[in-house]
């Protein structure tokens, strides 16, 4: 009987430890910032999310409420370096995503790294800093 209780108790401790450890191990080091509108696009807003887990890095940037730019390309820069361009959809949203596991270049992101989204002509739409 004692052995049975010991096994049951040990099993419960292991299950509890896994329940705590697994979500912690799976939780990525994630940082999200709000992107603020420029004077030229006061209704615009956006967000940028950087995730790092093990050797994988992922960066997502989205800008919204820019309907007057529908069908046009916007330029995404991180830390002053060109990340890429995206076309503004019919809803006035443009998004770019990069993931190192897909072989894509993901720039280094630290506290203070700036994110800027501009029109193809160079007019600032939104910006923010990690």
Label each region the model flagged.
Residues 3-9, 18-130:
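N-terminal targeting/export leaders
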Residues 13-15:
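Eukaryotic membrane transport/trafficking proteins
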């Amino acid at each position: 009987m004692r052995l049975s209780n010991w096994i049951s108790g040990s099993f419960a401790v292991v299950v509890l430890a896994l329940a705590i450890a697994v979500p912690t191990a799976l939780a990525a080091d994630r940082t999200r910032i709000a992107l603020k509108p420029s004077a030229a696009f006061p209704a615009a807003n956006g967000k940028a999310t950087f995730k790092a887990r093990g050797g994988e890095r992922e960066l997502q940037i989205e800008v919204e409420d820019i309907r007057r730019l529908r069908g046009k390309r916007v330029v995404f820069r991180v830390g002053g370096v060109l990340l890429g361009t995206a076309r503004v959809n019919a809803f006035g949203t443009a998004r770019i995503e990069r993931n190192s596991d897909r072989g894509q270049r993901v720039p280094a992101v630290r506290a203070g790294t700036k994110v800027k989204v501009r029109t193809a002509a160079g007019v600032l739409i939104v910006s923010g800093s990690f």
